[in-house]
């Protein structure tokens, strides 16, 4: 297997370099780099009546990693929620998937929010060194778009949102 060399700059001496949790892990872990604890507030969804919009009453918490990456041209870093956060604490990335472009050189940060409105404390405390997300760096194909009057036919056609089965 070819290994992609990625340069990483510690913006904080206490930042933790990314590591893979196991030999077969698809993603590497990103760690919180915090001087103090941070609390991740929940979204209070309350009762939603027909015609009402769902409004967030708490804001997401941005947690820095203390790291900047030099992602090779033609690649992108994708940041995902950790599965344990979702299953155990209902914590997720507020933007679902983070996208770090190859020309970005600033600190990689993660925006976390908890949907656990049943929790007594309604917050999750994140401490320095906690694993806050997982990420992978993948090749990004160059794409050229071609406008056409008609697209080719498929069995699925225009069916979307559950049209392929349960």
Regions found by a protein language model. Give the residues of each.
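Non-catalytic terminal segments and appended small domains
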Residues: 1-166
């Amino acid at each position: 297997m070819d290994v992609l060399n990625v340069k990483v700059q510690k913006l904080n001496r206490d930042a933790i370099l990314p590591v893979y949790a196991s030999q077969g892990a698809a993603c590497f872990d990103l760690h919180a780099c915090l001087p103090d604890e941070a609390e991740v507030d929940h979204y209070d969804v309350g009762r939603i009546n027909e015609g009402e919009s769902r409004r967030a009453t708490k804001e997401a918490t941005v947690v820095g990693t203390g790291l900047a990456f030099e992602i090779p041209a033609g690649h992108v870093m994708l940041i995902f929620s950790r599965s344990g956060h979702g299953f155990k604490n209902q914590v997720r990335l507020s933007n679902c998937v983070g996208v770090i472009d190859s020309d970005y050189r600033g600190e990689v940060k993660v925006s976390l929010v908890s949907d656990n409105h049943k929790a007594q404390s309604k917050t999750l405390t994140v401490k320095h060194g906690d694993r806050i997300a997982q990420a992978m760096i993948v090749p990004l194909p160059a794409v050229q778009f071609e406008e056409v009057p008609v697209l080719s036919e498929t069995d699925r056609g225009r069916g979307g949102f559950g049209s392929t089965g349960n």
